[in-house]
A protein has these predicted regions:
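Bacterial N-terminal signal peptides that target proteins for export
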Residues: 2-13
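Extended carbohydrate-recognition surfaces in non-catalytic/accessory domains of CAZymes
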Residues: 48, 52-99, 104, 528-595, ...
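Short, compositionally stereotyped local motifs that mark structural "simplifiers"
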Residues: 444-544, 552-556, 562-586, 598, ...
Length: 683
């Protein structure tokens, strides 16, 4: 009896624990949703990069490629860079005008550099004299004026703040070219300074919408420090939103991260737009020309058409668009920036309903443009207006109650339906030469059938290969073929995983009530012979490496260069480097793999890299870029294979990691236990 009571009590406690855990997850999710609500509705914001770097305006000693990074890209000593402060006197700065320009453009929030990597502060900090009030003749707290004006005009004020600080004596590491001593520097003391300034920013200027961190990539910063800073900021302003650059979870310029394990509320793609949505909150930040800070010689401006279509593209994928302006040292927005923002505002005044408070497209692909959604409403953003007056909307199953032009609601549009698509009879001329918007209204939430998905670990295989088919809708059947023919109503319908033994072309299509309601999707899976393993090689643990000095924009031909150093390392790592910039490594050796399989190799690097197995280049991640991951696949026989990895670093951030995975190996850094080098006898 006691045993039975104990079991019942244990079950009750287990169920209670599960319920409490579920409730905690729901409450946590609801809290974040409430906090993120205004940001998700806004969709469009203004980024401002402004500081002492506006004084040289991108030019130093005849070179005109610089901007906000000029201290390090032009290698200007800190004491010399400080001389820009007395020259920074932006007497034409007008907070009211800046906010009006953003508001008229249709932007809902402003993010400005309170401090960039150069360490100079645009606010009155009590922790340093290296700020706009104490170090410049301007003597005005720019952040105070902007925050007050944003509140007056109904925009959210947000801060960009750099974790990296090239000016502060306790920040480490020093720049590779610097002669400034690091003796006595204390990074923990710098963290206290960083936290102190963050506290000033989130307690002295009222409610702040977003704290947009940056400069987190150097090895003195880590995930724990990022998590601590995230929690600290939220303790000061619980409703503030913080980007993913507070910690170390960001995957380079792609800006992606795992929101379940890394600190931050949203991803930050930089100068790029993801090909699809990311499954979590994200915001693309982008320049109008080629620089963030003001560069007087940069006239490579994106067109208004390009910028408006980028805004639509980003919104259709569930993201926000943070568009940058780099003001002059006088305090003015460059005229080309003003012109483009005004043109975007003109479009937004007519079409803003299709951007604000919308969610991502329900369609997998629209050849003529993009789409956004609201409850019981779809917005069709037409880039390419049909010359024949017929706009085909593939996948739209639900019948609309009405259809009309957003620019002219009185212009009604007729629709007729075929299985799996709607056809709209539109006016001959596009209402807008850049993007025309059509509104579809429904009684209930619209049903859109996406193309079926064909999923597998890889497009090539050497062992029996599993393929899965899926649809976004219920009450449908996926019919498929494996012989290259198109599916019909008589083709088998998908019920379980398909196993392939030979090269096969899989075709599938979604059916409902005996009729096809989607396009045919095709994917070919190729059976390949794995690369033969090397035999009779005498091996020792480790890898050969050669180390080089030089300035490159892409991987050089290392056969033509003399190395500075060489030796043996246990894995792919660059700790033996002698400088922080302008160096390269070449690693050679062999990798052992446990079984015949398709292996995926990944290289994360900043700057360029490549990975080869034998003579085949598997990963090409070359060129100048921020931290970026590239990958490639190759079928390998169990055993030993030659591997070569090359990497170069030009300037700025540095990153280098090599991973692999297979159908039975989860993605991981290639372990030292799998890496060897052949002895001279073997060579």
């Amino acid at each position: 009896m006691l045993k039975k009571c104990f079991i019942v009590r244990s079950i009750f406690l287990l169920v209670l624990f599960c319920l409490i855990s579920s409730l905690f997850v729901v409450c946590k999710s609801t809290e974040k949703d409430n906090r993120m609500a205004w940001w998700r509705e806004a969709r469009f914001g203004l980024f401002i990069h402004w500081g002492l770097y506006a004084v040289p305006a991108g030019e130093w000693e005849g070179e005109t490629r610089h901007a906000e990074w000029i201290l390090t890209t032009a290698q200007i000593p800190v004491k010399q860079y400080e001389k820009f402060a007395p020259q920074f006197n932006p007497v034409k700065f007008d907070a009211k005008q800046w906010v009006e320009i953003a508001k008229d453009a249709g932007m809902k929030y402003i993010v400005i550099t309170s401090k960039h990597h150069d360490g100079f502060c645009l606010f009155d900090s009590k922790l340093t004299d290296y700020d706009v009030v104490d170090a410049t003749p301007f003597k005005r707290d720019i952040m105070k004026e902007l925050s007050e004006e944003c509140r007056k005009q109904g925009l959210k004020m947000c801060w960009y703040h750099s974790i990296m600080d090239w000016h502060h004596p306790d920040y480490l590491p020093r720049r590779q070219w610097e002669k400034r001593s690091a003796e006595g520097a204390d990074f923990n003391r710098y963290i206290e300074y960083l936290k102190g300034q963050v506290k000033e920013l989130v307690t002295n200027y009222g409610e702040i919408g977003v704290l947009w961190f940056d400069g987190e990539w150097e090895n003195t910063w880590d995930q724990q420090k990022g998590s601590d800073l995230y929690k600290y900021v939220r303790s000061l302003q619980p409703n503030i939103i913080i980007n993913n650059r507070v910690g170390k979870g960001r995957a380079g310029m792609a800006g992606t991260f795992d929101p379940e394990t890394a600190a931050g509320d949203f991803g930050t793609p930089e100068q790029e737009i993801p090909s699809t949505g990311l499954g979590y909150d994200w915001e693309t930040c982008m320049t109008m020309n080629d620089h963030w800070g003001y560069n007087k010689n940069d006239h490579n401006w994106k067109s208004t058409k390009d910028l408006i279509r980028k805004l639509v593209d980003i919104t259709s994928k569930g993201g926000n668009f943070l568009l940058n302006v780099g003001p002059t040292a006088e305090g003015l927005f460059p005229q080309p920036s003003i012109d483009r923002l005004a043109a975007m505002g003109k479009w937004m005044k007519i079409n803003g309903e299709s951007i604000y408070r919308t969610t991502a497209s329900l369609f997998s692909k629209l050849d003529w443009g993009r789409s956004t959604a609201k409850p019981q409403k779809l917005f069709l953003h037409v880039f390419d207006w049909p010359e024949n007056g017929k706009l085909h909307v593939p996948g739209l199953v639900s019948k609309a109650e009405s259809a009309y032009l957003l620019a002219d609601p009185k212009t009604k549009i007729d629709i007729y339906y075929k299985y799996g698509e709607a056809v709209l009879s539109v006016p001959k001329e596009a209402p807008d030469s850049i993007v025309s918007v059509i509104v579809l209204e429904f009684k209930e939430e619209p049903e859109v059938v996406r193309e079926p998905e064909i999923k597998a670990e890889s497009d090539i295989f050497c062992n029996p290969h599993e393929v899965k088919l899926s649809s976004n809708l219920g009450n449908v059947k996926i019919r498929y073929t494996l012989d290259g023919s198109n599916p019909t109503s008589g083709s088998p319908f998908y019920q379980k995983v398909i196993t392939l033994e030979k090269t096969t072309t899989v075709k599938c299509q979604i059916y409902r009530n005996g009729h096809a309601i989607s396009n045919v999707v095709t994917k070919t899976f190729k059976k390949v012979d794995p690369r033969k393993a090397e035999k009779n090689i005498d091996l020792k643990p480790g890898l050969y490496y050669k180390y080089y000095h030089g300035k490159w924009e892409k991987l050089p031909d290392f056969n033509l260069i003399e190395p500075v150093d060489s030796g043996i390392v246990t894995r792919f790592e660059i700790s033996t480097k002698e400088r922080k910039e302008d160096f390269a490594f070449k690693f050679t050796g062999v990798i052992t793999v446990p079984e015949n399989d398709v292996y995926i190799f990944y290289v994360v690097s900043d700057d360029g890299s490549s990975l080869s197995i034998g003579d085949e280049v598997v990963v090409d991640n070359d060129g100048l870029h921020g931290s970026k991951e590239a990958f490639g696949r190759i079928a390998l026989q169990a055993g030993t294979h030659p591997i070569t990895v090359e990497f170069f670093q030009r300037s700025g951030g540095v990153d280098f990691e090599v991973f692999y995975s297979s159908t039975k190996i989860t993605k991981q850094i290639i372990p030292s236990s799998s890496l060897f080098y052949p002895t001279k006898k073997s060579n």
